[in-house]
């Protein structure tokens, strides 16, 4: 298996610190709002990578944090008239709801930064003691010049960074690029007791501390969105390696941005979507497959038209699964015949090809193509004349390959019936309101999917054709 390591800017053989085990840390959300589709891509990508590693036999300890104390949290809490803790509690709950709806598996642990204050203070104290940090008027800064390899992740030179820095320079700092690891309390802000007075941690130190305490001095994979590479991950490396003298993370993985209608997503451009808004209109499988239809290191463009195309493609997959489920009930032959055994063995090539693609830096786009190829083959060769054993095997194989991607796991019968009944209700409502255009559109859309409606005195019935 090869993974692209941002630290070295090349694909490397994936060799874990302990054979068969993976220690993985992913930077999670700042819990002051619902997460948007850009965040959703990051969460889906690393959920998929975690699932695939488990599929390949690794035992994965997966940590994804909640940032529940920072400037954004404080600003939002003050605007709402709530406490930072109340805000964090609320949006952590909302995160779990949306993540569950998106079929994102629960992490081994989701630590909150505020649960680690004692450990953070110890971390900061150690850095001061080792000469990597200094205190001024209750603020503590990390000295970037003391860490000789600062810039190694982002490939940036410290002197060039200093020259081009647009940061509002605090004249008290020894160097413009030094960053805060502990902040002195300001009026109206939550604070904790420390050797430097009342204050709170800087953002970067929180992740370093949680990773250290939950996974140890060196971890296998540290991951997050590409926007975190600098300065967040660069600063994490500096703090962690300055403290321990050991490599912080062996492999650094970064997922690329989501653009909306070929523009960067932003509230000012009015092209900002939360995952929840999209999940109200589309199933999780659609959003997941869309997010995984491009390589995770490549930017993807989001639009409703592209989601509709993804849904249409996914419907074709589910129609094939539905046909196989129906065949399972209808076929007469129970046991595999000799010629079927040969065909069953031939189907293994799709599993091998899928693994080959996913082993190459988690190429989900090509892996999805393999699933489509498999289903095209099965549609042609698995029929009413096939044995029950072969039909079941093909169904199991499709679901096996869909599982690491978090798609194709539902029984189509239950989900299809639920969706159709919902559309029939919408059509009935449109007819009552004499909205004939909408009623006809719903009927025609269903017909395109192979569903025919029959209006009877007993109500609307439907059947597949």
Curated annotation (Swiss-Prot):
The coenzyme or cofactor needed here is: Zn(2+)
Where is the protein found, in the record's own terms? Answer: Cytoplasm
Query: Per the record's keyword annotation, is Protein biosynthesis included, yes or no?
Result: yes
**Catalysed transformations (reactions):** tRNA(Cys) + L-cysteine + ATP = L-cysteinyl-tRNA(Cys) + AMP + diphosphate
For biological process, the GO terms are: cysteinyl-tRNA aminoacylation
- What does the UniProt keyword field contain? Aminoacyl-tRNA synthetase, ATP-binding, Cytoplasm, Ligase, Metal-binding, Nucleotide-binding, Protein biosynthesis, Zinc
Matching entries from InterPro entries are given as: Cys-tRNA-ligase, Cys-tRNA-synt_Ia_DALR, Cys-tRNA/MSH_ligase, CysS_C, Rossmann-like_a/b/a_fold, tRNA-synt_1_cat_dom, tRNAsynth_Ia_anticodon-bd
Motif annotated as 'KMSKS' region, chain positions: 264-268
Please give the family membership noted in the entry: Belongs to the class-I aminoacyl-tRNA synthetase family.
* Name of the protein described by the UniProt record: Cysteine--tRNA ligase
């Amino acid at each position: 298996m090869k993974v692209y390591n941002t630290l070295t800017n090349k694909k490397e053989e994936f060799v874990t610190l302990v054979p068969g085990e993976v220690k993985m840390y992913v930077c999670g959300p700042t819990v002051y709002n619902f997460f948007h589709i850009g965040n959703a891509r990051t969460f889906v990508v690393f959920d998929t990578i975690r699932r695939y590693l488990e599929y390949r036999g690794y035992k994965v300890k997966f940590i994804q944090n909640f940032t529940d104390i920072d400037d954004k949290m404080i600003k939002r809490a003050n605007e709402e008239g709530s406490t930072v803790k109340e805000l964090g509690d609320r949006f952590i709950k909302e995160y779990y709801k949306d993540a569950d709806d998106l079929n994102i598996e629960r992490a081994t642990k989701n630590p909150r930064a505020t649960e680690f204050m004692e450990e953070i203070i110890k971390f900061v104290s150690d850095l001061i003691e080792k000469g990597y940090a200094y205190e001024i008027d209750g603020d503590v800064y990390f000295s970037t010049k003391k860490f000789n390899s600062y810039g190694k992740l982002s490939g940036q030179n410290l002197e060039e960074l200093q020259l081009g820095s647009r940061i509002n320079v605090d004249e008290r700092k020894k160097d413009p690029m030094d960053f805060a690891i502990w902040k002195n309390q300001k009026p109206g802000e939550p604070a904790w007791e420390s050797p430097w007075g009342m204050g709170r941690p800087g953002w970067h130190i929180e992740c370093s501390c949680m990773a250290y305490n939950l996974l140890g001095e060196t971890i296998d994979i540290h991951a997050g969105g590409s926007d975190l590479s600098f300065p967040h991950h660069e600063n994490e490396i500096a703090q962690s390696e300055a403290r321990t003298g050991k490599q912080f993370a062996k492999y650094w993985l970064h997922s690329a941005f989501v653009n909306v209608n070929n523009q960067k997503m932003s509230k000012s451009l009015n092209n900002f979507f939360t995952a929840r808004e999209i999940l109200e209109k589309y199933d999780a499988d659609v959003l997941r497959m869309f997010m995984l239809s491009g390589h995770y290191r490549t930017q993807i463009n989001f639009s409703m038209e592209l989601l509709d195309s993804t849904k249409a493609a996914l419907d074709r997959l589910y129609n094939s699964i539905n046909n196989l489920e129906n065949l399972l009930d209808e076929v007469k032959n129970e046991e595999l015949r000799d010629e079927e055994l040969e065909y069953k063995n031939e189907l293994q090539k799709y599993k091998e090809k899928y693994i080959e693609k996913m082993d190459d830096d988690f190429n989900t786009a090509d892996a999805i193509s393999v699933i489509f190829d498999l289903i095209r083959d099965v549609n042609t060769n698995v029929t009413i004349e096939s044995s029950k054993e072969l039909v079941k095997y093909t169904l199991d194989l499709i679901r096996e390959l869909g599982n690491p991607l978090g798609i194709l796991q539902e029984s189509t019968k239950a989900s299809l019936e639920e969706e159709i009944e919902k559309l029939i209700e919408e059509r009935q409502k449109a007819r009552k309101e004499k909205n004939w255009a909408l009623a006809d559109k719903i009927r025609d859309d269903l017909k395109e999917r192979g569903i025919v409606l029959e209006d009877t005195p007993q109500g609307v019935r439907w059947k597949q054709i």
